[in-house]
Amino acid sequence: ARDIDIPLAQRHFYYHAGMAQLMESELPDAAALGVCGQVIPWNFPLLMLAWKVAPALAMGNTVVLKPAEYTSLTALLFADICGQAGVPKGVVNIVTGNGAVGEMIVSAEVDKVAFTGSTAVGRRIRGATAGSGKALSLELGGKSPYIVFDDADLDSAVEGLVDAIWFNKGQVCCAGSRLLVHEPVADLFYAKLRARMDKLRIGSPLDKSIDVGAIVDPKQLASITTLVAANTAGTTHVAPCDLPVEG
């Protein structure tokens, strides 16, 4: 929140506020779409909101946004700030709830649907909007390979991998969750990686000196635990750590 979510959200609103002033000169033939239905995930609550809301408002649209169940308070606080800033009622609308509420937004009489989330849900939204005339934008999760060649600076590559896969506790749609290493340096790289993993600090995400904080909710913890337990192929390295009892 301190290093990414809040500062980047501020920059997005600043940028699109400038675009709003240049719309007539830079986009003379563009017109507002109308009502934009938007659904966002929980990994960057304010930044995901900014990506959806800022450009839509800048181009003269109104929005109906559904935040993730786990991070609704951020969006509700944003709505309160909009009211304090004088944004007219009905321009920014926040609706909370589970996936069924997201389906309501997709099926409603909106002019555009914007979704950030899983590929499986994105496919369902694409099918639901096909032939409807609604504009659609999808930003879907995937597997990003992290590739290490034999001429790489291995120490720097290890640090880069740590950032790629454990930044925000790995809760990033483009996290480097696949590692491909050139065979001549594979054993040395794996040894350096294991040593670095053993030094990762676990604790409160509010502590800036911590490497890995809490994930979003118990369901995610159970899912991750199941994936780790099911990974019996090949060599497995489990870095020792003391997990917090609470929080």
Predicted segments — roles?
Residues 112, 120-247:
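ALDH superfamily catalytic-core signature
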Residues 1-23, 220, 224:
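Long amphipathic alpha-helix in the N-terminal Rossmann-like dinucleotide-binding domain
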Residues 12-156, 180, 187, 209:
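Rossmann-like NAD(P) dinucleotide-binding subdomain of oxidoreductase/dehydrogenase enzymes
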Residues 1-9, 29, 33-35, 247:
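Short intrinsically disordered, low-complexity coil segments enriched in acidic
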Residues 6, 10, 53, 75, ...:
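Short amphipathic alpha-helical/adjacent loop interface patches that line ligand
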Residues 3-6, 96, 109, 161, ...:
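A general structural motif at alpha-helix termini
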